[in-house]
Amino acid sequence: MTILFLTMVISYFGCMKAAPMKEANVRGQGSLAYPGVRTHGTLESVNGPKAGSRGLTSLADTFEHVIEELLDEDQKVRPNEENNKDADLYTSRVMLSSQVPLEPPLLFLLEEYKNYLDAANMSMRVRRHSDPARRGELSVCDSISEWVTAADKKTAVDMSGGTVTVLEKVPVSKGQLKQYFYETKCNPMGYTKEGCRGIDKRHWNSQCRTTQSYVRALTMDSKKRIGWRFIRIDTSCVCTLTIKRGR
C-alpha cells in the first residue's frame, strides 16, 4: 500500500512548478516521502498575485481529488474486516529517510493546507470566530505525535499476533535508509492523565488510552525471515468510559 500511495502522489504532484507548503530548506534532502512535492518559489513570484490566487484554488481542488483517490484505493486493498477485526485502519505513517523527517506525513499536511485555504477565504471576523481556541474547544484527551525509529521500537506485533523485530535500516540501490514511524499517543504529562476532559466524574470513570493501527514495515520474524509485514504502532489517544456502580 505504501508503494501505491507514493505512486499516486508522484503522479499528481510531479508536474507542479511550485509546492504549497513551506520553504525548500525545511525538508531533509534524503527524504523519500514526498518526491514530487518540492518548493521552488511561490505562485505569486512566478506568475504574479492573480496567478497565485488561481493556483491556490486549483491546488485545493487537486488535493481533494487526491484524498478521494487514496480513500478509494484504501477500501480496495483493505483486508476482510470480519477476519481481521483488529485491522481497523491502515495509515501512511511510515517514511524511509536518511535523517529524521521534519514534517508530519503527507496526508496530515494536505489536511492542514486545506484548512489554511478555507481560512484564507474567510473574513477576519469570521476567521477569529471559527478558531477552535477562541471558541474554547479542547480535546477530550491530550496527545503527542513524533517520529520514532526502529531503534526506539525494537519489536512489534504483526497481524497474526506474533512478535517480530523491526529492522532499523532498509537497503536501497544507493545504500541504506532508516525506517521512521509517525506515532501518536496519550501525553503522560498532559492535563488528562487522571481522566478525560469534560467527563462528569460523579457518574463516570474515564481514562485516556492509546490505540494502535497497522502500517507496513520491513521486519524479521522468529525464523529469521525478512519481509514487509503489517505491524501495530500507536496512532491515536481516545477516551474510554465505564459507568460508576453503587450510586
Swiss-Prot record:
Xref: Pfam families: NGF (PF00243)
Q: GO cellular component terms?
A: axon; dendrite; extracellular space; synaptic vesicle
> Which residues bear sugar attachments?
121
Record's comment on post-translational modification = Mature BDNF is produced by proteolytic removal of the propeptide, catalyzed by a FURIN family member. In addition, the precursor form is proteolytically cleaved within the propeptide, but this is not an obligatory intermediate for the production of mature BDNF. Can be converted into mature BDNF by plasmin (PLG).
Q: Is the keyword Signal in the record?
A: yes
Q: Keywords assigned by UniProt?
A: Cleavage on pair of basic residues, Disulfide bond, Glycoprotein, Growth factor, Secreted, Signal
What SUPFAM superfamilies does the database record attribute to this sequence? Cystine-knot cytokines (SSF57501)
Signal peptide feature range: 1-18
Q: Does the record carry DNA repair as a key word?
A: no
Q: Which InterPro entries match?
A: Brain-der_neurotrophic_factor, Cystine-knot_cytokine, Nerve_growth_factor-like, Nerve_growth_factor-rel, Nerve_growth_factor_CS
- Which compartments does it reside in? Secreted
- Site description Cleavage, residues in chain: 57-58
State the protein's purpose.
Answer: Important signaling molecule that activates signaling cascades downstream of NTRK2. During development, promotes the survival and differentiation of selected neuronal populations of the peripheral and central nervous systems. Participates in axonal growth, pathfinding and in the modulation of dendritic growth and morphology. Major regulator of synaptic transmission and plasticity at adult synapses in many regions of the CNS.
Please give the family membership noted in the entry: Belongs to the NGF-beta family.
Protein name per its UniProtKB record: Neurotrophic factor BDNF precursor form
Q: Which organism is it from?
A: Ailuropoda melanoleuca (Giant panda)
